[in-house]
Amino acid sequence: KGMYKMERTKIAVVGATGMVGQRLLVLLENHPYFEVVKLAASKNSAGKKYGDLMENKWKLDIKMPEYTKDFIVEDAMDVKSVANGVKLIFCAVNLDKKELVALEEAYAKEEVVVVSNNSANRMKADVPMIIPEINAKHLDIVDVQRKRLGTKKGFIVVKPNCSIQSYVPVFAALKEYGIKEASICTYQAISGSGRTFEEWPEMVENIIP
């Protein structure tokens, strides 16, 4: 009682109909820092109510969050409209690499922070790839990126791929002991491509037990 209640940052999820977008919406439900105010996806999904659109497309075992169902999905390519009124977007869209780079930069130029789940910008020298517990200092490179993009507040930051984020924290903890060599073997889940066995039947006979 009487405690200060922090105002949450208004955000959009771009790519809200895909598997990663769905997972983001679950994670963002009742989030203490972020308030989802917009959902965006492909032109084919635009103008439809999210709950109706996803009735037979929801892929997660967890139920679709109630708060998402009444959102009218916007066209992800309508950058100005989606960016209006939000400070940050989570981006998880399926596009050609060049198109994706252009889209994320367009959002950044609307002065919003773009947190990307995509690989397109991961190799850019001035786009930080962050594991917060390990290399938060890399965010300093954002100033260089802003100069390139001509922005004051907008920038892009990316998350690493699923393999890197699984083992790098362990290596970081052991770094002081002087690791000289490491042997790594990763096994990629088909869910990483946003698909399931039901949607990818050719994979069923392509698994070595």
PLM features: what roles do these ranges have?
Residues G2-I208:
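N-terminal Rossmann-like NAD(P) cofactor-binding subdomain of oxidoreductases
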